[in-house]
Structures are given as C-alpha cells and as structure tokens.
C-alpha cells in the first residue's frame, strides 16, 4: 500500500512540474508579449484560487494544458495582438473541441476577456473555413469500390435532419423550415456514402425541412452522376421517381437482404457522427451557413474515425441480429403463405366436389 502511495505521489509531483514548465514555456515572448501574471491574475481573481478554478471547469491540470494555447489566443485576439495558436494541430484541436461541445471550457476560462459567445463562434468559423478545403480533399473521398452482393452499386444515399429554432414569428414565414414528417423546424443534409468503406463521398448543402429528399438530390445530380460514373446507388422509398436523373436502386420493405443490409450502413454513419460530435445531437442554435461549415467538418473527422474503426466491424453483432430477424420474418411470411394457399386449394376442391367432405 505504501509503495502505491509513493508511486502516486511521485506521479502527481511529475505532473505538477510538467504543468508548471509548460505554462512557463507558453508565455515566452512573442511580437507583443503579454505577461503570464496578467492573464493568470484575472483568472484567479475570478475563481479565488487554483483548486476552485479546476473544480469549476471540471478538468485536470494536464487537460488544462491542451486548452491553454486556445484560451490565450482568444484572450489576446480581443486586444488585436498575435494569437498563441501557431500550429495546425492546435487549430484542429480547437475545432474538435467545439464539435465535441467542450467549447464551454474555453468560454469559462476567457469569461473575463470576452462577454459574448459570438466572438468565439466567429473565431471558430474563420478557422473552420480555412481548414475545410484541405480536410475535404484528404478525408471526404470516394474509392469507387463495388461489392459482390449488390452488383452494379457503389454508393448509398440518405438525408438526415437537425432541429433549429423557429426562424420567424409568423407561421407562413417559417413554414419553409417546418418538416411535416418530423413535426418540427429543421435543416436537412444529404450524404452519399461509399458502399464498401462507409465514408462520406458527397455532402450536400443544407436545405429547409420542407424540401423533399428528391429535390435535394436533384439540386446536385450532376455531381452525383460524375462520381457514380455509370454505377448506381442504394436509396430508400423516399427517392422513388428519381431514377430518370440518377441511376438508383430503391430498397423496398421486402427487397432481398443484401440491399437492405447495405443501405442500413448510412444510418450507422449518422449515428457515429452524432455520437462523436454531440453538438449535432442537439438543436442547432446558430445560422445555416455556420451549420454547413461545421457539418462538413464533422463529416471529415467522422470519415477519419470510420477508416480507423469501420462501421461494419464495430456493429457486426447488431447487424447479424438484424439480418437474422429479417430472414426469420421472411421465412415466417413464406410459411404463412404456403399454409393459406393449401387451405384455399383444399376449400375450393371441397366446394367444386373434387374432394370428399
């Protein structure tokens, strides 16, 4: 027991030394240096002491070091000075912080410098717009791989919606964002997945909730056709009638099992996205342009996660269970049909006198 206490004490001491050293290094002079004491004094005066600070923001000292450069950048940019975010890794970490809804930690630490949330959101949007083209090239890609169980098909398409606040006081003005299917005001996004890898290949712009799935697809049908290059894609019943614009395989309720199993992959992708980035699991309170930027960014990071942890392998047990249920349901329907057919034939034979009573 004493050895465990000693080891823990030594580890905490090393963490304190590392924390203090990195904090000191973070305040090295820049073009217009800001002393560490100036920022630290404001923060401590707001919370009282260091223990109360870490208890309030609910993070440990090592985690606090990751946020330190971001906090200083937000605080110093308020004064028009050079920020502390200098590397791409730190900027991407800032974006992932927002997508994971841990931006409140940054807001609490800069509360003495920035009174509103708008300034932080503007900073995030500027960074996101700068990195989004590079991330799209690297992570939103199409492998053009076919699967043997669904011949001639290379993509899966579906739409998903996010609730937004009512855009106007009068219902006629806000009717465009109202979805009769979901019964709420929402924004709609369409995602085309690679059928084998499960990564997003095409992400449409946002549309009001009243726009149908077919209208969303027809708005960028040329891009989809260029990516398909003669192959087809899987879609649900909401896309019936779009075959004239884009080669589509409509998966009906009683379609063969491989197509149904493959089409469910897009639902798994939406679930993975909302699981990783909780900011998309709740109502979106910002503007439509901001929604487009951060949704595309979330798809880039989700693609990276899917390539590391494939959807099909991660959900293999669940998918096997769904496949078995579908197969059992189909067998039950066929068996019921056989029984009813035999009963009908026997009754008709009896009525026509071909069989004894």
Task: Give, region by region, the residue ranges found by the protein language model.
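Amphipathic alpha-helical protein-protein interaction segments
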Residues: 53-57, 83-87, 97, 113, ...
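Short, well-ordered alpha-helical scaffold segments within catalytic/effector domains
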Residues: 61-64, 91-92, 214, 218
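Charged, often Cys/His-bearing segments associated with DNA-binding zinc-finger transcription factors
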Residues: 1-82, 311, 318, 327-328, ...
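Short, well-ordered secondary-structure "scaffold" segments embedded in the functional core
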Residues: 101-357
């Amino acid at each position: 027991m004493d050895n465990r206490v000693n080891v823990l004490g030594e580890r905490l001491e090393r963490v304190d030394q590392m924390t203090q050293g990195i904090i000191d290094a973070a305040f090295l002079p820049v073009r217009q240096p800001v002393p560490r004491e100036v920022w630290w004094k404001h923060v401590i005066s707001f919370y009282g002491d260091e223990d109360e600070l870490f208890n309030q923001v609910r993070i440990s000292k090592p985690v606090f070091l990751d946020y330190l450069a971001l906090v200083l950048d937000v605080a110093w940019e308020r004064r028009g000075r050079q920020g502390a975010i200098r590397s791409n890794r730190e900027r991407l970490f800032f974006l992932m912080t927002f997508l994971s809804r841990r931006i409140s930690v940054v807001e609490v630490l800069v509360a003495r410098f920035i009174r509103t949330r708008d300034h932080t959101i503007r900073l995030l949007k500027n960074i996101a717009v700068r990195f989004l083209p590079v991330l799209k090239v690297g992570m939103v890609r199409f492998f053009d791989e076919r699967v043997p169980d669904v011949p001639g098909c290379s993509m899966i398409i579906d739409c998903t919606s996010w609730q937004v606040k009512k855009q106007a006081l009068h219902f006629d003005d806000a009717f465009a964002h109202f979805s009769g299917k979901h019964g709420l005001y929402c924004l709609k996004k369409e995602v085309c997945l690679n059928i084998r890898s499960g990564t997003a290949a095409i992400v449409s712009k946002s549309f009001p909730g009243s726009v149908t799935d077919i209208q969303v697809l027809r708005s960028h049908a040329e891009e989809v056709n260029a990516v398909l290059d003669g192959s087809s894609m899987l879609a649900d019943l909401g896309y019936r009638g779009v075959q004239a614009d884009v080669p589509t395989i409509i998966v009906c309720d009683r379609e063969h099992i491989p197509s149904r199993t493959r089409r469910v992959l897009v639902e798994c992708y939406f679930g993975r996205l909302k699981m990783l980035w909780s900011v998309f699991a709740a109502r979106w309170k910002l503007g439509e342009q901001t929604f487009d930027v951060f949704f595309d960014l979330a798809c880039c990071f989700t693609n990276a996660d899917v390539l590391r942890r494939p959807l099909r392998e991660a959900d293999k047990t669940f998918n096997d269970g769904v496949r078995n249920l579908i197969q059992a349901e189909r067998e039950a329907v066929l068996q019921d049909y056989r029984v009813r057919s035999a009963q009908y034939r026997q009754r008709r034979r009896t009525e026509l006198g071909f069989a004894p009573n």
